[in-house]
Each structure stands twice: as C-alpha cells, then as structure tokens.
Amino acid sequence: LVSQVESRWGKIDALINGAGPYHRVNLFDETPAGWREMFEGNLHPIFYLGQAVAPGMKARKQGRIINFSMANADQMVAQPEVTGHYIAKAGVLILTRTLAKLLAPYGITVNAISPGFIDSGSAPPDELAGVVKRIPAGYIGSVGDTVAAVRYLLSEEARYVNGANLHLSGGWGI
C-alpha cells in the first residue's frame, strides 16, 4: 500500500491512523474472532504502516505520524465490556511512544490523539444526552474538534511535540 501511494503521489509526509473496529461485549462473552479483530484492526495496522512509512520519512528527515487511541486508555482501569478494544488502544499509546523515540532523531514526530465522546452523527441522540452529563466540559466534542487536533499535530507549531497523548475529551476520562 505504501509503495503504491509513493509511486502514484511521491512522498508520504504524514500518516494518520484513525480507523479501527469497536464492539461492546463482556470479556467472558468475547469470542476468539472478536478478540483478534480488536488487535488486527486497532493495533497491528499502526505497527505495519509505521514500519512501512518510516524509511521514506527517515530519508527525508521529516514526517508526522498520528495514531488514534481512546480517552482513558492510559489510565489502566478495568473495562469489562470493551476489554479487547481497551487493551489494543493502550497498546497504541505504547507503540506511539516507542515510534516517537526511535524516529525523533530523523525529524519525525509521532503522537496520539485520544478522543472521548465525539458526535460524528452515528450515535442516537438519547444516548448522547445521557453521556454529556459525564463530561466536565458540559458538551460532546465535534468532528471539527478532532480535525483541529490533527491539524495542530501536523503543523510546524507542533514540531517539538513528540510522544504526546492529546486527550480530546472535554475532561472525561481523566
């Protein structure tokens, strides 16, 4: 995939790892396939894509990698209904910091964004109304809030920000 992108458009300046499956199931009801899906969809692509884009970024001595985790993944609190997803997203944070340390000498920054509740239009309004009560800021984040965080980490203003985990949660999960 990386070589196809590079051959068609040239260089890769930034890698944003934002997609990944999510499901809510009690740990004791989790299936081997569901467990595997959480790691194969949330953690493994970040490893493989980071490994694939690193040589080109290192050669140019510049690049940005942004990985999406989840709010409170750094808390190490039991999450019985989303255990596989939670462990994979905690792994994203460890991988982010490791890549940041390895790639910093080459002018490459690697950071994480850990969103809490973001209204992307897919959640039922009644569910969002219940959630907003748990957010200290008093409102649910927007897709625009997420875009602003990504834009910042891609900018020159963030050139010294490396290995960070930017909580995008209105204070929820901290």
Language model features with spans:
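C-terminal substrate-recognition "lid" of short-chain dehydrogenase/reductases
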Residues: S142-L168, G173
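Alpha-helical segment proximal to the catalytic Tyr-Lys
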Residues: P55, K101-L102, R159
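A short, exposed helix-loop element centered on a Lys and neighboring polar residues
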Residues: G50-Q51, R97
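Catalytic loop of short-chain dehydrogenase/reductase
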Residues: I66-G91, T96-P105
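Substrate-binding pocket helix/loop in short-chain dehydrogenase/reductase
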Residues: I12, N26-L27, G34-F39, A123, ...
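Short, small/polar-rich loop/turn modules that mediate ligand/substrate recognition or access, typified
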Residues: A104, T109, V161-G163
